[in-house]
């Protein structure tokens, strides 16, 4: 069995599995390739639900502090159990469980969202405020938007995780009116208004784009 963990993920497993099952715990996101063993099924326990696997390839996003719990199947078969509901997935299907209790089953069309295993953060028509939540997950820095005008700007693009948060923000900055201020000690990045100023006279002019 192969497991690949995403950023800020906690994964625990026993040093020796039980004789009749394989149980692990996950808080975060991981990609699994589970070897088949009908006599010893594989279980993933999370704060929002449980996955039962016989032999398959799937992605599980189950951060305890997130609003959505997602299971995406690429090969094989899994059973997702949430709030007493059993959902059986087929390859190329995803099930989303929302904190309001809604369960949504859909066909996977966009596989870029799973390219985090390659070190890529792929964004598709996402609002800036939601992108900042994603960046916080991947980069670790807390990002505070002080320029509320840009919260609903939408972006599509790919960012290399290894290049860091500031590099990713500078790419977004080309198309939106904000500046970046970083507090390295507190690991906080502030997104502020864009402005121009005359240094010696201390006259500030805020401009909108």
Which residues make up each language-model segment?
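A residue-level detector for the "anchor" residue at the start of short, highly conserved motifs
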Residues: 1-199, 203-205
């Amino acid at each position: 069995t192969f497991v690949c963990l995403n950023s800020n993920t906690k994964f625990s497993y026993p040093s020796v599995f039980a004789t009749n099952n394989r149980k692990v715990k996950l808080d975060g996101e991981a990609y699994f390739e589970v070897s088949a063993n009908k006599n010893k099924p594989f279980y993933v326990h999370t704060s929002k639900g449980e996955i039962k696997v016989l032999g398959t390839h799937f992605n599980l996003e189950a951060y305890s502090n997130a609003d959505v719990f997602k299971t995406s199947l690429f090969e094989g078969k899994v059973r997702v159990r949430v709030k007493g509901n059993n959902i059986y997935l087929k390859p190329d299907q995803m099930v989303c469980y929302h904190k309001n209790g809604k369960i949504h089953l859909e066909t996977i069309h966009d596989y870029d969202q799973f390219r985090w295993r390659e070190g890529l953060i792929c964004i598709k028509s996402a609002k800036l405020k939601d992108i900042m939540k994603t960046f916080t997950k991947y980069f670790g820095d807390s990002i505070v938007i002080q320029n509320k005008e840009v919260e609903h700007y939408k972006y599509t693009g790919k960012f290399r995780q290894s290049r860091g948060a500031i590099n990713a923000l500078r790419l977004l900055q080309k198309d939106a009116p904000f500046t970046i201020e970083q507090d390295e000690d507190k690991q906080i990045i502030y997104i502020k208004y864009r402005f121009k100023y005359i240094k010696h006279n201390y006259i500030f002019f805020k401009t909108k784009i």
